[in-house]
A protein has these predicted regions:
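Alpha-helical linker/hinge and terminal dimerization helices associated
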Residues: 7, 43-44, 65-87, 301
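Short helix-boundary/capping micro-motifs
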Residues: 12-27
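A short LG(V/I)-centered, amphipathic sequence patch enriched
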Residues: 41-58, 256
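C-terminal effector-binding regulatory domain of bacterial HTH transcription factors
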Residues: 67, 245-253, 263-311
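Central regulatory/effector-binding core of bacterial HTH transcription factors
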Residues: 92-155, 304-311
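Flexible hinge/capping segments at coil-to-helix
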Residues: 152-163, 167-192
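Secondary-structure junction motif
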Residues: 188-210
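Hydrophobic hinge/microswitch elements
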Residues: 214-258, 265, 274, 288
């Protein structure tokens, strides 16, 4: 029995969710796929998969085996790439994901410079505000905001961003500057989260402490993107809660003013992630080494000019 082949079939079955998908992808008859996985289970003396008409479910032994098998297959692939000379020069396709506005403002300029430097690398840049699963969606690198619970992901810290509350000068002149988060319930607010609770509220922090406080807000306008929320706030529709980089340009030119800064929650870390451990493919290592210092510099420059708080 070719254990590496059977191992690869098992991992692909777990990733794709069916033996039929393995058969199509690996161009192997379905009975062969089923037999090889059964032979692997027989060799190991334990059940790895529970098969049903709808889905495949890993047993506890199967989950432990697949976790190790993925690392083994990655190491074999790395060894083959090294022997084939891939590591002599960066080349190939690279998939990168980032939040929409952060990606447009900061990642895209880095990507364009990187492509000019490395003509044999192609990049697929996915801009999305959802947390893309690196392994399941075959993504090489991700820019992620917030804490990182998954220990199988390797992170490089880039900096941090803030959740800020802001409004236009004309809106504040007409309605007054709120002095506490609880004042927001009296003002029209802008939300760009359609999944908000029926009684929306924004989190804040008690000044000088780490104690979180939650203030109810009255949402007058709900939109689907941060850009639309920024535009609506500039137009004077209401108060918006956004991430600092999303409003940095508008604040810097005076179109928006930050309020309640002393109540802001703890800043969120920004990290660059890649899956797996050990030796990185040269295309991934090259992008990490190229992008990380440039993104750190861009975020530092943005922090130096945050605009002034309304008073």
């Amino acid at each position: 029995m070719d254990r590496l082949e059977a191992m690869a079939m098992l991992v692909e079955a777990v990733d794709s969710g069916s033996l039929s998908a393995v058969s199509r992808k690996m161009n192997v008859p379905l009975p062969t796929v089923s037999r090889k996985i059964a032979d692997l289970e027989s060799h190991l003396g334990t059940r790895l998969l529970i098969r049903s008409t709808r889905k495949l479910v890993l047993t506890d032994a199967g989950a432990a085996y697949v976790s190790v098998a993925k690392r083994i297959l990655e190491q074999v692939a790395e060894a083959e790439r090294t022997a084939a000379g891939e590591y002599s020069a960066p080349r190939g396709d690279l998939s990168v994901t980032a939040p929409i506005v952060f990606g447009r403002l900061h990642v895209l300029p880095v990507v364009t410079d990187f492509l000019a430097r490395y003509p044999e690398i192609n990049i697929r840049l996915m801009l999305s505000d959802r947390n893309v699963h690196l392994i399941e969606e075959h993504v090489d690198m991700a820019i992620r905001l917030g804490t990182l619970p998954d220990s199988s992901i390797t992170a490089t810290r880039l900096g941090e961003v803030r959740h800020v509350v802001c409004a236009s000068p004309s809106f504040l002149a007409a309605h007054g500057v709120p002095e506490t988060p609880n004042s927001l319930v009296m003002l029209p607010c802008i939300s760009h989260d359609f999944l908000a609770a029926p009684r929306p509220a924004w989190p804040f922090r008690k000044p000088g402490t780490k104690v979180e406080i939650v203030a109810p807000v009255r949402v007058r306008l709900a939109v689907t993107t941060a850009e639309a929320a920024v535009d609506a706030a500039i137009a004077g529709v209401g108060v918006a809660r956004l991430i600092s980089y999303q409003v940095a340009e508008a604040v810097a030119r005076g179109a928006l003013q930050i309020i309640l800064a002393q109540y802001e929650p703890e800043p969120m870390p920004v990290s660059m992630l890649h899956a797996g451990q050990g030796i990185l493919p040269l295309k991934v290592r090259s992008f990490l080494d190229f992008a990380a210092p440039r993104l750190r510099a861009a975020m530092a420059a943005e922090r130096l000019n945050p605009g002034r708080e309304a008073r």
